[in-house]
């Protein structure tokens, strides 16, 4: 087998393995979580998810939308630690925090 064809096949194999690895769920905690977020979000800053984009509409008199304080005990905020440290998550889920 000639060398260029071998290198192309080798590179294709590595890319396939890397693509599969991105879909595997892992636990990301502590410094590993921070470094992974920094690598994923290199062009954006890491921000906390907003509670709801609909919350601002409820103050405008939309009666069918609940108020932001509606049943606060039942609503549990889930953060990146809940989703990716306590439970395993994929890089796709982790990227939603960018």
Swiss-Prot record:
UniProt subcellular location: Secreted
Modified residues (Pyrrolidone carboxylic acid): 20
Entry keyword annotation includes Secreted: yes
Principal place of residence: secreted
PROSITE patterns cross-referenced by the UniProt entry: INSULIN
Intrachain S-S bonds: 29-85, 41-98, 84-89
Key words of the record: Cleavage on pair of basic residues, Disulfide bond, Hormone, Pyrrolidone carboxylic acid, Secreted, Signal
Statement: the UniProt record of this protein carries the keyword Secreted: yes
A single GO cellular-component term on record: extracellular space
GO molecular function, one term: hormone activity
Pfam families listed in its UniProt record: Insulin
Propeptide: 50-75
Residues in the signal sequence: 1-19
Family label: Belongs to the insulin family.
Main function: PTTH is a brain peptide responsible for activation of prothoracic glands to produce ecdysone in insects.
Name of the featured protein: Bombyxin E-1
Organism: Bombyx mori (Silk moth)
Gene, per the UniProt record: BBXE1
């Amino acid at each position: 087998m000639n060398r260029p064809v071998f290198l192309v096949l080798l590179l294709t194999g590595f890319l396939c393995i890397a693509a599969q690895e991105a879909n595997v769920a892992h636990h990301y905690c502590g410094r590993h979580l921070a470094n992974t977020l920094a690598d994923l979000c290199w062009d954006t800053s890491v921000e906390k998810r907003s509670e709801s984009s609909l919350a601002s509409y409820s103050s405008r008199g939309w009666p069918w939308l609940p108020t932001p304080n509606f049943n606060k005990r039942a609503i549990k905020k889930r953060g990146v630690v809940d989703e990716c440290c306590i439970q395993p998550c994929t890089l796709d889920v982790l990227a939603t925090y960018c």
